[in-house]
Amino acid sequence: MRKIGLAWQIFIGLILGIIVGAIFYGNPKVAAYLQPIGDIFLRLIKMIVIPIVISSLVVGVASVGDLKKLGKLGGKTIIYFEIITTIAIVVGLLAANIFQPGAGVNMKSLEKTDIQSYVDTTNEVQHHSMVETFVNIVPKNIFESLSTGDMLPIIFFSVMFGLGVAAIGEKGKPVLQFFQGTAEAMFYVTNQIMKFAPFGVFALIGVTVSKFGVESLIPLSKLVIVVYATMLFFIFAVLGGVAKLFGINIFHIIKILKDELILAYSTASSETVLPRIMDKMEKFGCPKAITSFVIPTGYSFNLDGSTLYQALAAIFIAQLYGIDMSVSQQISLLLVLMVTSKGIAGVPGVSFVVLLATLGTVGIPVEGLAFIAGIDRILDMARTAVNVIGNSLAAIIMSKWEGQYNEEKGKQYLAELQQSA
């Protein structure tokens, strides 16, 4: 009997979760029984992310051993991220202006959701300027950064440590072997944890559907449709077009990442697939030094789906209140989002926090966010999938840009996937 692939297992878990959540809609016992299962799965993933990032980066950087080369890669990566996320903001603004998802919506028919936790988080984040964000990339205590899961300081430390290992030559070989062994062991652990993924997805989706009110979705159905349609357009037209410029087929990337996309979509967490997409991009021909740097950094600076949604949601709320935003106001919104959407990936409910920090500066009532908070989970699932594709593509593009992409390895990996399909 043929073994069912992971993508199908996760998909079955997703469907069963929807069915169970729908049958027991409004029953608090669903959350009581299933939430712990979902939480355990998410905690297992979070447990392995930092060890994988550190070990992979140290090994990758030590193999390069050149600060000038790494600086060049870092500069190119940030430029690419800024260009793509700016395009995402423009696409979100255009979609909101063309399709007018907030026009004609009766605010009295909408349910308000408590967003106080997001407000509190925003107040904490807003104390940090863009300059402080860059200053905080350098950790004053690496163990503090490790305990809080602050990814940018961890990446910075790992790069510096990898350069140090390379600089001491023969003396550094035992250290390098230790981190190589750690990386391999952690990828093995990842594969074992992924066997639990269908159960984690079943539990998380079951809880979401059991709590989610259809009555809150109907008045906002146009927003949901516009968001999903725009996300699909961004994947196939924008990312697909960029991929083609570099000789990459976007459908090949989607085929490679099918397991990860279903998992990221179901859990609304791109962190759940970080170790797997690093591993797969390496198998697809990207060098470890580039995948281990570009993909984790992208989680802070290249959230394409999130930035697109933030632009679209901002205009939606303006339309909801009957505010007609001028071109100059929308350009101001674009410029503000270019800054506020960067460097706070570790913050819970990052898209909401960015919107809370942004709306007031361009004259849009922040209270409007309470109307869309109830359906945020459904929208979050879509933007998470886009984030995963965007960061995976970034690793391939940077590998090609640096002239380090292994075409033969990539073709061989694709052929292996087609044979096993």
From Swiss-Prot:
Transmembrane stretches, start-end: 4-24, 44-64, 78-98, 149-169, 199-219, 223-243, 245-265, 307-327, 331-351, 352-372
Protein family according to the UniProt entry: Belongs to the dicarboxylate/amino acid:cation symporter (DAACS) (TC 2.A.23) family.
Organism this protein belongs to: Bacillus caldotenax
Keyword field: Cell membrane, Membrane, Symport, Transmembrane, Transmembrane helix, Transport
Membrane topology: Multi-pass membrane protein
Cross-referenced PANTHER family: PROTON/GLUTAMATE-ASPARTATE SYMPORTER, PROTON_GLUTAMATE-ASPARTATE SYMPORTER
Entry annotated with the keyword Ribosomal protein: no
GO cellular component, one term: plasma membrane
Compartments where found: Cell membrane
Annotated GO MF terms: symporter activity
Source organism superkingdom: Bacteria
Subunit structure: Homotrimer.
Biological process (GO), any one: dicarboxylic acid transport
Name this protein carries in UniProt: Proton/sodium-glutamate symport protein
Sequence ranges on the Extracellular membrane side: 25-43, 99-148, 220-222, 266-306
Function: This carrier protein is part of the Na(+)-dependent, binding-protein-independent glutamate-aspartate transport system.
Main location group: membrane
Cytoplasmic side: 1-3, 65-77, 170-198, 244, 328-330, 373-421
UniProt entry tagged with the keyword Translocase: no
